[in-house]
Amino acid sequence: MRVNITLEHKESGERLYLTSKNKRNTPDRLQLKKYSPKLRKHVTFTEVK
């Protein structure tokens, strides 16, 4: 079952990206490297509940 999730950068508090994941294949929190326009570099965004 695929669910929509929000990705947040913990240090700046940005919630810019929406994506989906399969809960069966990825039960842990998703972490993706994405571009942060606020910091102007690629940083790690983490799944938020």
UniProtKB/Swiss-Prot annotation:
GO terms for biological process: translation. InterPro entries: Ribosomal_bL33 (IPR001705), Ribosomal_bL33_CS (IPR018264), Ribosomal_bL33_sf (IPR038584), Ribosomal_zn-bd (IPR011332). GO terms for molecular function: structural constituent of ribosome. It comes from the Bacteria. The keyword Cell membrane does not apply. GO terms for cellular component: cytoplasm; ribonucleoprotein complex; ribosome. Keywords: Ribonucleoprotein, Ribosomal protein. Belongs to the bacterial ribosomal protein bL33 family. PANTHER family: 50S RIBOSOMAL PROTEIN L33, CHLOROPLASTIC, LARGE RIBOSOMAL SUBUNIT PROTEIN BL33C. This is Large ribosomal subunit protein bL33C. It comes from Streptococcus pyogenes serotype M1. The gene is rpmG3.
